[in-house]
């Protein structure tokens, strides 16, 4: 499983050096490739191919005929998905089309989140962390109480 956050830079050619920690997990548990897709204007998602196949199957099973919001979300993820393999230096080429759609450029944070990686712009990541730390702990406790999560 992936974890941790790494501040990185996308070079002028659009390449991102994937930390060895993440490459090792991919090589050991999956294949040395990821599927990258657009989730929002703030973030790209990167899945091991096997995990992406599960997500894609779930997306294809969504009942979207009468729900334009879900249909657009389904299309966003599926239409923008591309397989990336790293080069001999451990870098992946982030597709230009995806780089064009997100509101970050070179300074990024690659975050491990269980079965996937998330690529955030550094400013967006920092804002998300500030918001999470500023959330009302009583409200969080209430919301968590409505779930089955046990920490």
From Swiss-Prot:
SUPFAM superfamilies associated with the record: AbrB/MazE/MraZ-like
Span of domain SpoVT-AbrB: 5-51, 81-124
Record family assignment: Belongs to the MraZ family.
GO cellular component: cytoplasm; nucleoid
Assembly and interaction partners: Forms oligomers.
Gene this chain is encoded by: mraZ
Alphabetized Gene3D superfamilies for the sequence: Transcriptional regulator MraZ domain
PROSITE patterns (alphabetical): SPOVT_ABRB
GO MF entries: DNA-binding transcription factor activity; transcription cis-regulatory region binding
One GO term of the biological process aspect: negative regulation of DNA-templated transcription initiation
Main location: cytoplasm
Listed name of the protein: Transcriptional regulator MraZ
Protein location: Cytoplasm, Nucleoid
Species name: Neisseria meningitidis serogroup A / serotype 4A (strain DSM 15465 / Z2491)
